[in-house]
From Swiss-Prot:
CDD domains per the UniProt record, alphabetical: trmE, TrmE_N
Similarity-based family: Belongs to the TRAFAC class TrmE-Era-EngA-EngB-Septin-like GTPase superfamily. TrmE GTPase family.
Cellular component per GO, a single term: cytosol
Gene Ontology terms for molecular function: GTP binding; GTPase activity; metal ion binding
Protein name (record): tRNA modification GTPase MnmE
Record: residues binding Mg(2+): S235, T256
Cofactor(s) needed by this chain: K(+)
Signal sequence region: none
Broad enzyme group: hydrolase
Cofactor note: Binds 1 potassium ion per subunit.
Amino acid sequence: MDLDTITSISTPMGEGAIGIVRLSGPQAVEIADKLYKGKHLLNDVPSHTINYGHIIDPESKEVIEEVMVSVLRAPKTFTREDIIEINCHGGILTINRVLELTMTYGARMAEPGEFTKRAFLNGRIDLSQAEAVMDFIRSKTDRASKVAMNQIEGRLSDLIKKQRQSILEILAQVEVNIDYPEYDDVEDATTEFLLEQSKEIKQEINRLLDTGAQGKIMREGLSTVIVGKPNVGKSSMLNNLIQDNKAIVTEVAGTTRDVLEEYVNVRGVPLRLVDTAGIRETEDIVEKIGVERSRKALSQADLILFVLNNNEALTQEDYTLYEVVKNEDVIVIVNKMDLEQNIDINEVKDMIGDTPLIQTSMLKQEGIDELEIQIRDLFFGGEVQNQDMTYVSNSRHISLLKQARQTIQDAIDAAESGVPMDMVQIDLTRTWEILGEIIGETASDELIDQLFSQFCLGK
C-alpha cells in the first residue's frame, strides 16, 4: 500500500470542547514536529504519551493553537503506523488551520474510512471487524453497540476462520483421494469424512443465519410505523415511547405533516420509531407529500402500531386503514382510554381477528408497559437473546452465508450421488472462497474500496 502520511479531522465539525486532527503514516511524527513547539521534540518522547505545547505556523511564526499531542508509534496503534493526534480546542476555524498546516508540510487529506482501511490492509483487523467499527459508531442502543463490539473483538471472524480451516482439512483429504484413486478404502473414508465435516459446517452456517433477523434488528433497529387516522394520539404515543416532545401534539387533526423518526430502546429491542402523517385524501400540497411519505414508510416497516380512538366509534376510515396494514406484523392500540368509551371493543376484535390488542391512555401513561412487552414478545418470543452471542447483522454477511450454505449443500449432494471427487472439490473450494469474502481474505479490491468509501472522514 502507499507509504504516504494521511491527515484528517477525526471529531465532528462544529463548536465543542475538543477537536482532534489525526495523522497516520511514516512521516506523521516528522510533520507534527515541524508545527509543534513544546518542552521536547515529539520525535524524542516515548510512545503512547500526551504532550503539552503549541502549534506554530513555521512561516509566520504565529501561534495557532494551544494543544495536547498524543504520540503513538507503530506497530501498537490502530493502523499499525505511527499516529499523531493533535487535540485542539473545539471550533471550526482553528482546527481547520491546524489541518491545513499538516497538509502544507507533507500530509495528504485522508479519504473516507482510510484510517480503518489501513488498519485492515496492515493486518490489524479483518474486513468484518472493520465493518463493525461503523456499526459501533452508528449504534443507537446499548445492545446494538455490544453486538458491534463483539464483532470488533473478532467473534464472527473466529467462527468464519474455523469453518474455512475445516474446509481446508476436507480438501486435503480429497486431494489424497484424487492422487490415489486406485484405493477404494481411501475413497470410502474420504466420502465419509467429507459428508460428516460438510454437514457440521452447514449446521454452523445455519446457526449464524438463524441470528440474522435479530442481528439486523439490533444493527438497524426495528422499523416501527405508527399509523391511524388523524388525532387518535399517534404523536403522543411517539413522545411517550421516546420521552421527548419531538412531535407536535395539538388538538387539530392533521398537524403531523411529515414523517417523524426516532430511535428508542424498548426492553432491549431497538426500535426505529416512525410517526406518519395520517393517510387520507387531501388537497393540501404539503400534507399530500406527508401522506405519500407515510405510504412509503408503511411499505418498508417491520412493525406497525395501528392506533384507534376510544372516544370515537369505528369509522370507514379506520376499516380502510386496517385493510392497508392487516397482512403485516401489527399491534392494534385503542388509545385515549381516559376519555368516554364510544368505541365498540367487540367490533374492533371482529375487525382485527387474532391481531394483538392493547388499550392505552397516553395522557395518563397507562398501557405503555403492556405495549412494550407485546413488541418484545412479537419479535423475540418474549425473551431477548443474550447480547454476548455472536450475531450476524450485516446484510453483506448474511448474503454471503446464504451463498456458502448453498455451495456446501451442493458438495454434500454431489458426494452422496457418487460424483467424482475432483468435481466435489470445486464446490468446497467455492465455499471456502465465499466465507473468505466475509473477513476480506478473498474480497476484491473494488469491494474493499467500495466498503470503506461509506465510512466517515477521520475514521
